[in-house]
């Protein structure tokens, strides 16, 4: 629920730094800032001044006042640029609280920007995405969303959709016009254009989610099959103990890397074998849980001579683990240690041949991983997207297909109903019709001070 009180928070990351920024927003922001600085502040001027708690100087720095509505939140906003010592910044926060401000909740500044129409919902989410981007391409894509590229695409689509829906509904309300839905080319061409645009946005959203959230890969296989060596080869550095002793990887090892700018979250699980060791058994439990949450499984085997290994073979290797694997999960069989062969088999289907120790076939494996998730590297057309965007677009796509079916049946009323449903799903992306629960969930994922 939006309250028009005044909020304050540290806007810079935790830890020591040259500069730390305090952000104040709300109806009393200027009064509080002038009480802290004992100066009259002009809008959009950088004023060098001391910062006080009553009459005691806390620090000195630059203070800037942004008068509503020309500010990030659309409210009066003051930013205090002080020295980046957490103790000093917290003293300034306490002084602001004593003057009547309250601590901001996570994402509350951006939430107020959304509620004051400074950003739509997709742009607001892009703020968090640009802060958390883990690759250069992801950061650039988030910047495009923040600038409104994604929102413009959705709004242009909505404009076409609303026009078509109004035309269809008018033909229903005024039957004397005698519009034949089966023969009206205006309806057919408009609906086909909307269908194609939604399909294109659907594909772009899929790419955007990959960039924003990354891909989670699980390395599984028998002990000493080379999972840790493969992890090191993919990451380009050593992150797990590599020995000839079975079961050396005693816990889940996480590594975050990039492949062609795509974030990869690689998890090397404990050696999957029956064990009386409590620590290793716990690792196996974690492995099962992580595999159920993964985008892909890389099943590593040192059976490099058998190109016919398949999903059901896992049951023979680890029968107690087999039933835990979702049967629809994407599995790639990575045949390791091919450096021991005189003649290397050709990659085929989901079977990739590598030598993790000698870095043979690693680039081909990376290419295979990206292909499996459908990443096409069309950077110029990608903007960041979230799972909720993908869900909304997918639902819109399903209902635009139903709309086409109703048009072919000549059923105007059901056609109009399907178009309305598509409109509602698209509206949910930019926040035209969004519940308070959804807004709370989105903005609570932001950092404090943003």
Curated annotation (Swiss-Prot):
Tell me the enzyme class: hydrolase
Which gene name does the record give? mnmE
Question: Domain TrmE-type G, which positions?
Answer: 214-374
Needed cofactors, names only, are:
K(+)
Location in the cell: Cytoplasm
A GO molecular function annotation here is: GTPase activity
Where does this protein hold GTP?
A: 224-229, 243-249, 268-271
Highest taxon listed in the record's lineage: Bacteria
Q: Indicate what this protein is called per its UniProt record.
A: tRNA modification GTPase MnmE
């Amino acid at each position: 629920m939006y309250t028009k009180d005044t909020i304050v928070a540290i806007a810079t990351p935790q830890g020591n730094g040259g500069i730390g920024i305090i952000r104040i927003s709300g109806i009393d922001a200027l009064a509080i800032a002038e009480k802290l600085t004992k100066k009259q502040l002009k809008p959009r001027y950088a004023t060098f001044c001391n910062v006080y708690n009553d009459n005691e100087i806390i620090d000195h720095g630059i203070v800037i006042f942004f008068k509503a509505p020309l500010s990030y939140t659309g409210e009066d906003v003051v930013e205090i640029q002080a020295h980046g010592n957490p103790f000093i910044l917290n003293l300034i926060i306490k002084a602001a609280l004593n003057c009547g401000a309250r601590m901001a909740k996570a994402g509350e500044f951006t939430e107020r920007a959304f509620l004051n129409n400074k950003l739509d919902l997709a742009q607001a989410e892009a703020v968090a995405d640009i802060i958390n981007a883990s690759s250069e391409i992801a950061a650039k894509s988030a910047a495009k969303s923040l600038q409104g590229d994604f929102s413009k695409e959705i709004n242009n689509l909505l404009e076409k959709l609303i026009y078509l829906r109004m035309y269809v509904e008018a033909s229903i309300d005024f039957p004397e016009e005698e519009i034949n839905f089966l023969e009206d080319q205006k309806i057919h061409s408009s609906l086909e254009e909307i269908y194609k645009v939604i399909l294109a946005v659907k594909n772009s959203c899929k790419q955007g989610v990959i960039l924003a959230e990354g891909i989670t890969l699980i390395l599984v296989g028998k002990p000493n099959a080379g999972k840790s060596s493969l992890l090191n080869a993919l990451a380009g550095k050593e992150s797990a103990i590599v020995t000839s002793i079975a079961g050396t990887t005693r816990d889940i090892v996480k590594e975050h890397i990039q492949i062609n700018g795509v974030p990869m979250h690689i998890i090397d699980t404990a050696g999957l074998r029956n064990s009386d060791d409590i620590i290793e058994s716990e690792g196996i439990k974690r492995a099962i849980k992580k595999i159920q949450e993964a985008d892909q499984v890389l099943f590593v085997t040192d059976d490099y001579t058998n190109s016919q290994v398949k999903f059901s073979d896992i049951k023979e290797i680890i029968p107690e683990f087999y039933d835990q694997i979702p049967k629809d999960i994407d599995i790639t069989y990575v045949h390791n240690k091919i450096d021991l062969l005189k003649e290397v088999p050709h990659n085929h289907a989901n079977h990739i041949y590598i030598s993790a120790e000698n870095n043979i076939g690693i680039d081909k494996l990376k290419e295979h991983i990206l292909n499996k998730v459908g990443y096409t590297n069309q950077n110029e057309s990608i903007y960041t997207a979230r799972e909720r965007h993908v869900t909304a677009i997918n639902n819109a796509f399903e209902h635009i297909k139903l709309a086409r079916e109703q048009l072919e049946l000549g059923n105007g009323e059901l056609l109009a109903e399907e178009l309305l449903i598509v409109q509602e799903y698209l509206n949910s992306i930019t926040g035209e019709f969004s519940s308070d629960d959804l807004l709370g969930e989105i903005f609570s994922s932001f950092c404090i001070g943003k």
